[in-house]
Amino acid sequence: MKSVLVVGLGRFGRHVAMKLDELKHEVMAVDIQEDRVDAALPYVENAQIGDCTNAEFLSSLGVRNFDVCIVAIGDNFQSSLETTSLLKELGARFVVSRAARDVHAKFLLRNGADEVVYPERQLATWTAVRYTADHILDYIELNEEYGIFELTVPAEWAGKSVGQLDVRTVSYTHLRAHET
């Protein structure tokens, strides 16, 4: 179990906090809007109303004690950048920040983010691949060249060994199968 600070409780931050709770992690959530904090109370250990661009407030949360700090602010890049930078200055161990554009990611990485996520881009890629390719049930992009696919077995593959399929001549592919 990890302790996670989620800053920003818009759609993305709220869903991250809910999933972390479902995975049994300890979650503290922070947002400047009281209604968002109130809505998060059922699925977080602790929730605070406050401005995370304020160093004193952010310091009062004990950011050094969290395994991961997730900056989920999506509607105000300046606040996201300031919060990311302050978290690192205050000793946060690992900071993940949300970006909408590559230029945002560059600034976030230069100012303290250990990693950057692009929720809209990542979901758009998953949706496009998942719903336009035959046999794909799920997809995880590892980088621009590699991905992991869960797929149904095409009829023409049934009863054949991996060697008989010769998938490596089509692309650099590794298969791992399991019965369900």
Where are these regions (language model features)?
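N-terminal Rossmann-fold NAD(P) dinucleotide-binding loop
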Residues: 13
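Conserved acidic E/D residue at the C-terminus of a beta-strand in Rossmann-like folds
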Residues: 31
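Short beta-strand element of Class I
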Residues: 27
